[in-house]
Curated annotation (Swiss-Prot):
Chain ranges for the short sequence motif 'HIGH' region as given in the UniProt record: 42-52
PROSITE patterns: AA_TRNA_LIGASE_I (PS00178)
Ranges spanned by the short sequence motif 'KMSKS' region, renumbered to the chain: 619-623
Recorded family membership: Belongs to the class-I aminoacyl-tRNA synthetase family.
GO molecular function: aminoacyl-tRNA deacylase activity; ATP binding; leucine-tRNA ligase activity
Originating gene: leuS
Keywords for this protein: Aminoacyl-tRNA synthetase, ATP-binding, Cytoplasm, Ligase, Nucleotide-binding, Protein biosynthesis
Name used for this protein in its record: Leucine--tRNA ligase
Species assigned in the record: Actinobacillus succinogenes (strain ATCC 55618 / DSM 22257 / CCUG 43843 / 130Z)
């Protein structure tokens, strides 16, 4: 055994062993309990970042631990390989997206291997490969046949100069990112999947996921947004037309003073035909892309249409306005406005001098000032005819009943969730498998024509999708008749919605899934990824699982039992201001720091001597140039050190602050462990450990070893507090470093302790532990060694410390045998000199004994 810890000599050799021996190959074995651990698959952007490393290290620790406790573990890895960044990179680097993507995959795969993750690489999935998306295309055609897929026009961002659709992130301040042309809103036909048909299941399923973070479940509940209300039909004055609105507050119905409709509403379009000012306003609204989140804060604007609706109960006219805060794709595209009891309606009514009619009063009878703000709480009805005096529930039901009797309304459950638009007008995605015949009929491509392959050898001009630019690509036949292929491609969330299931049978070519394999491995036991995916990927992934279940491909209701959302990785960020007043961000690796006695940064200089501003700890990002390259850290410190720091520096769900001093500390710790094994191996134990022959000091040390085993087992296995597990191992290591190796039983305890420490650290730092396990004389490799078990007998305390109180104040501490009786403890407490002093001249009136902890005297 070499004297110094040299990760550069160990890690590559161990990784080579794992690769040659296919150590982590997962094979279905019905005699063993399975465990499927999965980290969200990465987009192959070119290089791993520290966020990836954190996510995958957590997954690897869980996988290796579960393997050691005897489970049949599957931990796969793959690539979410379609997506917009590849198109931009292809134009920039004058290459094809496929070539750029495959090169990135090779590079990043090597980076993952260097970090020592225990993946079964034979199950690798790359979502841009035709053999993968063939089955996605097939499944889409099956959903179409079931009536779960439809096509309708939808609003998109359109660049009139490039004549192309832009993703939201390609719109910068209302203009095209490429040519700076103002972006228009256009309606084009798009494909949708009916996720709304599953809204109730998606909502109810959250109650069956006790091991998901509450925050994620709350975010999904809010996103699905179930509400109970009434859909009310208003007639249009002097017309046969009607307009429907949905409200969750029918109790306020007598307070309606106007109606607001979206710019795209048919009533708005009709009114604009003879009103140029209104037509201009509508066009402005349509060209202003408004995210739902911005609605609350933006300036409310509107214009009267000149049309009136008729209040179904009172018969009074209700003016109809076009308003910029009503979105056509939410609800009916029309809202009834009650300014007295809705703040947004109030602001609009105040601005345009519309009536504000109070119909709800506080239950406590207090007056409200409707000149300042709306009263939005529930209360009792006023100015509401026969419903006056009713509370919210009674009024809801009473008014809903009346509207239903009149044929002017119906109770309805609504969802905020909208159907999933899966069309993208981009090139680098899976082609949507639909065909248009000469007569205009649209049909799904038959299985024998799948996959519809995306051509990979293309030239990107940065403007038009190559498959849209090439009319020949779309030409095909259907049952001998000419047809055209769809030139839109799938939203890339499609691929990441079912990859977890394909990992169970990636080489299966007879269908989308081999149900036998899928039902053995699924559901995923542990899923790991960022909370930013809560309402997109994690919702689509749950939805897709239910679609797979209903197609008979999987048997469970949910895709994963347990979810862990790891925190972000932060690093110090530094900048200086250029002569043109621009912030120039400087990489922390190029900064020299001065710190005060508390370790706070007081001065920062770049390598040219410029004084920098410290912007604090922020999320590692390209924009702030504060990312740390994992590869550089692995080359400098070794993979095990990087992994150890990642797991120790912070609880898994919390943000992690990258500190290179902490990485250096992790390296020193592994060096100490190596050194301890080296010293022990100079004179290892030659006789077996004899627990009955140990001294008090030896028993105490061994007790510490087994208490640490118990704590680490609980911290890793149940609590998933990996940082506290490592802290406990470090504390034990401090004791072992000071322990004697003089006697044979001392060395036997040390041998047992080192064997335990190496096994406990193996999931976290597998390379060094692989080597140390061999150095400790074990024949088998550690990869198949069982997890270390705590010896209950060794943890029993022989003595206990009892605190002695007199009249509620601590007056002594006594050490007594662990099995000492209460009366004997009382006598031992009375024998303590300090206790005697405080009891002197007093009569004991009461004693209280908390077994093994406290003996208290009450005396007067």
């Amino acid at each position: 055994m070499q004297e110094q810890y040299r990760p550069d000599l160990i890690e590559a050799e161990v990784q080579k062993y794992w690769q040659e021996n296919k150590t982590f190959k997962a094979i279905k074995d019905t005699n063993k309990e399975k465990y499927y651990c999965l980290s969200m698959l990465p987009y192959p952007s070119g290089r791993l970042h520290m966020g990836h490393v954190r996510n995958y290290t957590i997954g690897d620790v869980v996988s290796r631990y579960q393997r050691m406790i005897g489970k049949n573990v599957l931990q796969p890895m793959g690539w979410d390989a379609f997506g917009l960044p590849a198109e931009g990179a292809a134009v920039k680097n004058n290459t094809a997206p496929a070539k750029w993507t495959y090169e990135n995959i090779e590079y990043m795969k090597n980076q993952l291997k260097v970090l020592g993750f225990s993946y079964d690489w034979e199950r690798e999935v790359t979502t841009c490969r035709p053999e993968y998306y063939k089955w996605e295309q097939w499944f889409f055609t099956e959903l179409y046949k079931k009536g779960l897929v439809y096509k309708k026009t939808s609003v998109v961002n359109w660049c009139p100069n490039d004549e192309t659709v832009l993703a939201n992130e390609q719109v910068h301040e209302g203009c095209c990112w490429r040519c700076d042309t103002p972006v228009e809103q256009r309606e084009i036909p798009q494909w949708f999947i009916k996720i709304t048909d599953y809204a109730e299941q998606l909502l109810g399923g959250l109650d069956t996921l006790p091991e998901w973070p509450e925050m994620v479940k709350t975010m999904q509940r809010n996103w699905i947004g179930r509400s109970e209300g009434v859909e009310i039909t208003f007639k249009i004055e002097n017309s046969d037309e009607t307009v429907a609105v949905y409200t969750t507050r029918p109790d306020t119905f007598y307070g309606v003073s106007y109606m607001a409709v979206a710019a795209g509403h048919p009533l708005a379009e009709r009114a604009a035909q003879n009103n140029p000012d209104l037509a201009k306003f509508i066009q402005e609204c349509k060209n202003t892309k408004v995210a739902e989140a911005e609605l609350a804060t933006m300036e409310k604007k509107g214009m009267a249409t000149g049309l009136n609706a008729v209040h179904p109960i009172t018969g009074k006219p209700v003016p109809i306005w076009v308003a910029n805060f009503v979105l056509m794709h939410y609800g009916t595209g029309a809202v009834m406005a009650v300014p007295a009891h809705d703040q947004r309606d109030f602001e609009f009514a105040t601005k345009y001098d519309l009536p504000i009619n109070q119909v709800i009063a506080p239950v406590n009878g207090e007056d409200i000032d409707l000149s300042k703000a709306a009263f939005t709480e529930h209360g009792k009805l006023v100015n509401s005819a026969e419903f006056d005096g009713l509370d919210f529930d009674a009024a809801f039901n009473g008014i809903a009943d009346k509207l239903e009797r009149m044929g002017a309304g119906k109770r309805q459950v609504n969802y905020r969730l909208r159907d999933w638009g899966v069309s993208r007008q981009r090139y680098w995605g899976a082609p949507i498998p639909m065909l248009t015949l000469e007569n205009g009929d649209v049909v799904p491509a038959p299985l024998q024509d799948l996959p519809i392959v995306l051509p990979e050898d293309v030239v990107m001009d940065g403007v038009k999708s190559p498959i849209k630019a090439d009319p020949d690509w779309a030409k095909t036949t259907y049952n001998g008749r000419p047809a055209l292929k769809e030139t839109d491609t799938f939203d890339t969330f499609m691929e990441s919605s079912w990859y977890y299931a394909r990992y169970t049978c990636p080489q299966y070519h007879e269908g989308m899934l081999d149900s036998e394999e899928a039902n053995y491995w699924l559901p995923v036991d542990q899923y790991i990824g960022g909370i930013e995916h809560a309402t997109m990927h994690l919702l689509y992934f749950r939805f897709f699982h239910k679609l797979l279940r209903d197609a008979g491909l999987v048997s469970t209701d949910e895709p994963t039992k347990k979810l862990l959302c790891q925190g972000m990785v932060l690093a110090d960020a530094f900048y200086y201001t250029s002569p043109t007043n621009e912030r120039i961000w400087v990489s922390p690796t190029k900064v020299t720091l001065e710190r005060d006695e508390k370790g706070r940064i007081v001065k920062a200089l770049d390598d040219e001597g410029r004084e920098l501003v410290h912007a604090g700890m922020t999320k590692m990002s390209k924009s702030k140039n504060n990312g740390i390259d994992p590869q550089e850290m692995v080359e400098k410190y070794g993979a095990d050190t990087v992994r150890l720091f990642m797991m120790f520096a912070s609880p898994a769900e919390m943000t992690l602050e990258w500190q290179e001093s902490g990485v250096e500390g992790a390296k020193r710790f592994l060096g100490r462990l190596w050194n301890l094994v080296f010293e022990y191996n100079k004179n290892p134990a030659k006789t077996a450990l004899n627990p009955t022959a140990l001294s008090g000091v030896q028993k105490a040390l061994r007790r510490g070893v087994h208490k640490t085993i118990a704590k680490v087992s609980d911290d890793i296995g149940r609590r998933q507090t990996f940082n506290t597990a490592i802290a406990a191992i470090m504390e034990l290591m401090n004791k072992l470093t000071r322990a004697s190796l003089a006697g044979e039983q001392d060395r036997a305890i040390m041998g047992e302790a080192l064997s335990a420490v190496v096994r406990m650290l193996y999931p976290i730092t597998p390379h060094v532990c692989f080597q140390l396990w061999k150095e400790l004389g074990n024949e088998d490799v550690i990869d198949f060694a069982p997890w270390v078990q705590a010896d209950e007998a060794a943890m029993v305390e022989e003595e206990k410390l009892v605190v002695v109180q007199v009249n509620g104040k601590v007056r002594g501490k006594i050490t007594v045998p662990a099995d000492m009786a209460e009366d004997d403890i009382k006598q031992a407490a009375l024998a303590d000199e300090n206790v005697q002093k405080f009891l002197s001249g007093l009569n004991i009136v009461k004693t209280i004994y908390v077994p093994g902890k406290l003996f208290s005297f009450v005396a007067k």
